[in-house]
Curated annotation (Swiss-Prot):
Keywords: Coiled coil, Cytoplasm, Cytoplasmic vesicle, Cytoskeleton, Endoplasmic reticulum, Golgi apparatus, Membrane, Protein transport, Repeat, Transport. The keyword Transport applies. Belongs to the VDP/USO1/EDE1 family. Residues 623-1034 form a coiled coil. Gene3D superfamilies: 1.10.287.1490, Leucine-rich Repeat Variant. InterPro entries: ARM-like (IPR011989), ARM-type_fold (IPR016024), Vesicle_P115 (IPR024095), Vesicle_Uso1_P115_head (IPR006953). This is Intracellular protein transport protein uso1.
Amino acid sequence: MDIFHKSYNVILSPPKVQQADETISKLCDRLEHATLFEDRKAAALGIKSFAREFKELVAAHGLKGIIQSLHRDYDDPELLKVTLETCLILTRHDDDSRASDTGLWIADQFILNQDNIQCLLQSISHKDFYVRLYSVELFSAILSCRPTELKDCLQTFPSAISSIMVPLRDSIEPVRNADLYFLSELVKDCTSIQKLVVFENAFETLFSLLENEGGVDGGIIALEALKFLNVLLKDNISNQNYFRESNHIPSLLKLLSVDTFVDGTWDTSRVQCVIEALYALQSLVPIGLSSSIANQNAVVSNHGIDVLLTLATHPDLLFFDVQKISWITLAHVVYSNARAQNSFVDSTFFDIKNTDVLTCLFDYLFLSSISPSHRYSVAFFLRSLTSENDELSSKFLKQIIHAYTHKQDNRLNIIQGYLDLVHLSDQDQYDNWFTSTILTYLVIDNDQRKYLLCSIPLFQDMDNDEDSESEDKVTFIQCVSTKLIATLRHENALQNCVGYLTLLIALVYGNPDSVKDFLSESSILQTFLTALMDESSSANSVIQGMIAVFLSLVYYYCPIESPVSKSDVYNAITSAVKRDVFINRLQRLRRMNLYEITFLSMKQKMHAIDDAADAFNTKIGEINTLDAFDEAQKQLKSLREEIDNTKEALDLSVKERSIQEEKLNESLKTSKTNLEEQTQLAEKYHEELLDNQQKLYDLRIELDYTKSNCKQMEEEMQVLREGHESEIKDFIEEHSKLTKQLDDIKNQFGIISSKNRDLLSELEKSKSLNNSLAALESKNKKLENDLNLLTEKLNKKNADTESFKNTIREAELSKKALNDNLGNKENIISDLKNKLSEESTRLQELQSQLNQDKNQIETLNERISAAADELSSMESINKNQANELKLAKQKCSNLQEKINFGNKLAKEHTEKISSLEKDLEAATKTASTLSKELKTVKSENDSLKSVSNDDQNKEKSVNNEKFKEVSQALAEANEKLNARDEEIERLKVDIIGLQNASLNMQSLKDSDNRTISDLESKNKELEKKLKEADEYWLLIVEELESKRTKDKELLRQCGQAVSEDEQSEEE
């Protein structure tokens, strides 16, 4: 009954809860150590079930067994599939932004052991579908965890990339797609892997894949393939050349051809694929590289321009990004390539459309229904089309000017609306800005085109040209400046202000004629300064910065014959704006992130100017300010005519005073010749100073190099010092230990020597006993001989017993006596034998003691040999240290040579400086003579003033101009002299620095020499101690060997044998 009750309780009791960590550890142990395949498979399935919830436990306990199963169970696809899937579960992380620690650890376990990567590479080419798929996905997971490490690891295998490329040609789509994703991530930012992939026929594989998928209509797979192609071509010149040489450009252009599309519907997948193909073509022809010229020519020869033009002007793509990227791709194709540019202009596309190039571009550029970014892509293409092609730029500019001058009503007449003051802001707010950018692209860096644009007639009725010949015409620059001033107060047209300023900066840069044209109306300059001074909250930093740049160029390129002189421009700027404020405007423009300033942000910004600028286009007393400006120009003309009449009246007085002027001219010519000579000398001195500066720069570099070498030497010496000190300490400790061992050995040797003495005394006693034994043995032998003779005689007498009885009796009596004597002898012999046995036991004891002494001597010899080895090692260390000290000495000598060379150069510089100072003194003397001559000229001018009152003003002007020229020349000479003085002072400071550096180097050298001498002395003392120790050891060994030989000789004399091994040791 008890049995049934217990079994009933067992059935009804709840089951025990099994812990996960125990189960996982058991399963992992079974997977790792089980011999049966079914056990390992069951364990792998159990581990897989726990892997999702307990990643850390499974990775900690079972990763070794999982990786072992990958190697061991390669032939079984089911178990291999389970293990690969388990690895995938462990490496994948829930958060896509950051890899988990478990995934990183597993990735490290695979990467650190190359056999694991090799196993994965083999499993990629497995027969089973899931094994191939999971292997590729596992590679992708490892790449997401450790990208750089996996790339470096794969490059160590020669056939890794070829193995990875095999699934890309697989007929099963999941495997192929997974491998495509993995490869596209693998080749990013790794040029070497990109080259290896291309050498495995990646281009042919990709194009065949695209063809099978239906080109740009292939969906996501085609998009990924095109992205992969773009990555292979971008920033990789060797792949670009291989792509061109293998004739793949027609295949890429075929993908972009509209005729190959399935239908006319443009869904998002097709648009994305076309855009990615255009990006790939852009990567093939990058801007700014000389290697892209061949690729540009190849695209042109394969009718790529017509294909791209068709996409860029396709009516269905007007509101897609495809059109914008097509114009940018065309810009890549024609940039700085005359052949491509001419082929674009001569394209049959424009003949079919019955239009010219510029009109077609302007149709899209000024189309307000499309976005500004689309329109700017056309402007960017126009810039690339005219880059480094002056002929085409001049042709386009002439077409625009011809349309304006002939008042043509077409797209080319963009200047008319651009300069019209009635419409200060265009309707879509971008036309004037685009016009400014186009004109800037066409005239930049070419003075002829700038003159052509600035010389067009403005604000004139073409029918009344003859009536207006006597009036001054308003120039192009003045009109653009006026339009800019009038536009500043319109908040919705500030992007046009940026365009106007950009064009003005391009016209003024490097062109004094344009600056003269701008300064012909001084009121415009004042209005610009008022805009620059604006400190209100609505002021725009970009516009103020560009105005500051423009005024800087105006001042820099201001010519001598300008209506407003250069000094007046400077005074006007400095009086209106402080220097710090002006620099602040420039710095604010420089700090602006211009890429973030979009058209919309420019539209929302506001700017205000003062009352004069606000009232510029208002009417005052029924008169327009522009008409008042024209009347002011007429008055200026009348004043110029009056000046001409006064000049004719003054010609007579000029002739009378021509003689005096000739004299003055001669004196001025002489002064000019002297100044020219001084300038030539100054140029020579300047060249010499430049050479000296270059030499000083070289010396500074050498000084820096020597300082760095000195620092390295100091560090090395410090390391050597520390090493020597530690080694010396160790040597002293070892020496003390050896001395202690020597003392112990000496004590032991004294004990052994005393024992040897006792042995010698006992051996002498044994010798005497042996001698007595030998004498007794000789006597015994003699007695035995006598006995033998007697026995012979007895035998003879026995034969004659009968006859000699008497003799027998006597013989018997003698025999008894002899027997008595023999008994006594036998007792003596037994006693002697006992004594010999005692002596032999003593000899054995002595021999055992000798063997012990031999063992002690051998241990001492071993210690001596070890000490000798240590001494030899210390000698080798000392030799190495001596070699290092020699090298340090050599480095110090080299540094000393460099310092001597620097001192020589410093001396040469001082000599040149002294010569320059002498030349400066001579130049100051000549300057003083010139000042005296100027004083004489002034006195002559004063005398001429009293001659005539009518001609006084003219003479004053002439003399003042000459005086100004001479004074300017003197000022320039003084400036040059001051500059030379400053350079001389700099040279002196550099020489002082060189001298200080040489002193520092000398002190460092002295300290190094001291340390070297100290180390050498210490080494010598150590060598002496080592020699003394060697001699002492040799003496001890010789004494031990001599005593050992004596002991052996004593043993031989005692009659004991010496082994052959001992004799060989003696030899």
